[in-house]
Amino acid sequence: MQVSVRDNNVEQALRALKKKLQREGVFREMKLKQHFEKPSVKRAREQAEAVRRARKLARKKAQREGAL
């Protein structure tokens, strides 16, 4: 990952880097990899996340259809 520093503004470059890392999911992955996660726990977590995503998508779709 690469961020250019313009006009010696390191703070702005750090913010841009943090935003890129956040978008890529690096922080979330690091948090998950801090400790070993049993395969059964991982599978359950991923299924719960999928259900959450599906509900969110359905909610957005219903809201969009209600607005039309």
UniProtKB/Swiss-Prot annotation:
GO terms for cellular component: ribonucleoprotein complex; ribosome. It comes from the Bacteria. Keywords: Ribonucleoprotein, Ribosomal protein. One of its GO terms (molecular function) is structural constituent of ribosome. This is Small ribosomal subunit protein bS21. The keyword Methyltransferase does not apply. Belongs to the bacterial ribosomal protein bS21 family. InterPro entries: Ribosomal_bS21, Ribosomal_bS21_CS, Ribosomal_bS21_sf. PROSITE patterns: RIBOSOMAL_S21. The gene is rpsU. It comes from Cereibacter sphaeroides (strain ATCC 17023 / DSM 158 / JCM 6121 / CCUG 31486 / LMG 2827 / NBRC 12203 / NCIMB 8253 / ATH 2.4.1.). GO terms for biological process: translation. The keyword Ribonucleoprotein applies.
